[in-house]
């Protein structure tokens, strides 16, 4: 299945209600992903501009977009989602574009 990276920011409401609702909301987000045929592969909680980086699989872009809309509508997070390819897929793509030419040619 295609892989997607979601960059997530907590809203002010999300931060203010984290203690009471944080775990429940996290589980709801995961259920929403799964209801669209997706799968949460991993999530990393971060310092900096984004609060969470999630790695997900979805059957297609439409399902990924639906998940972003549904989960953003919960009000506690803002989501930016983008398709991603693995390092191996990237290398295959480069070979398809340029073949197996030696460096400098």
Model-predicted segments: where are they?
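Short, well-ordered beta-strand segments in beta-rich or mixed alpha/beta enzyme
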Residues: 4-9, 44-69
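Alpha-helix boundary/interfacial micro-motifs
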Residues: 19, 26-28, 54, 65-68, ...
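Flexible, active-site-adjacent loop/turn segments at secondary-structure boundaries
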Residues: 8, 13-16, 45, 72, ...
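Short S/T/G/P-rich N-terminal loop/turn motif that feeds into the first structured element of a domain
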Residues: 1-34, 39, 50, 88-105
């Amino acid at each position: 299945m295609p892989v997607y990276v979601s960059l997530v920011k907590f809203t002010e409401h999300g931060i203010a209600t984290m203690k009471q609702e944080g775990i429940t909301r996290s589980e709801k987000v995961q259920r929403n992903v799964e209801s669209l045929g997706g799968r949460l592969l991993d999530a990393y909680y971060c310092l900096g501009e984004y609060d969470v980086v999630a790695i997900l699989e979805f059957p297609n872009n439409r399902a990924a977009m639906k998940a972003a809309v549904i989960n953003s509508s919960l009000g506690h997070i803002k989501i930016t989602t983008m398709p991603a390819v693995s390092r191996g897929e990237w290398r295959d793509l480069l070979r398809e574009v340029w073949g197996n030419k030696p460096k400098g040619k």
